């Protein structure tokens, strides 16, 4: 992703307006403005505008995980690739764009999400996004693309896992697949 961004003229690790991004989790309660398309795992779009902010974690959270006092959040809007609609007010984990790692573990995300549901607190919850210039076939699962470039990975797959990987990758293409083998 960073190599492709560099080729496109992006000079920083940080997200920029025009970046292609992908959601890494389902957020069924967040829908686009016109078509009411939900934000799901694998939703791809273009970052249209944003600002960076920092949120304080609530007391109950910091008591349980004292090493995390606050989280950098990118608040922005995304133009959907599939239908030119917009998702607005997305609260994205800034660190995940920079390092590829979420600031919060799944257990911490669950804790903070449940806390917000109980209290009705409108605090920002960091959602998982990353760049979408090159994605794994697992991230593309459920989506379809005109052209797919698939590398036959040299992982220690069992035979059936290797076949599932190839099947998942190949079936993402609607027009053309290029398979790069060893």
What are these regions (language model features)?
Residues 1-182:
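Core RecA-like ATPase module of SF1/SF2 helicases and allied nucleic-acid translocases
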């Amino acid at each position: 992703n960073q190599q492709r961004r560099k080729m496109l003229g992006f000079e920083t690790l940080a997200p920029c307006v025009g970046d292609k991004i992908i959601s890494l989790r389902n957020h069924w309660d967040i829908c686009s403005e016109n078509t009411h398309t939900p934000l799901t795992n694998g939703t791809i779009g273009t970052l249209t505008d944003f600002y960076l902010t920092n949120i304080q974690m609530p007391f109950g959270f910091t008591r349980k995980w004292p090493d995390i006092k606050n989280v950098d959040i990118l608040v922005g809007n995304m133009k959907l690739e599939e239908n030119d609609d917009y998702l607005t007010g997305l609260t994205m984990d800034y660190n995940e764009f920079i390092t590829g790692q979420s600031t919060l573990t799944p257990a911490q995300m669950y804790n903070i999400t449940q806390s917000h549901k109980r209290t009705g607190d409108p605090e920002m919850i960091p959602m998982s996004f990353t760049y979408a210039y090159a994605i794994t076939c697992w991230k593309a699962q459920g989506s379809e693309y005109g052209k797919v470039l698939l590398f036959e990975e040299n992982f220690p797959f069992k035979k059936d896992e290797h076949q599932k990987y190839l099947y998942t990758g190949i079936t993402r293409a609607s027009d053309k697949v290029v398979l790069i083998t060893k």
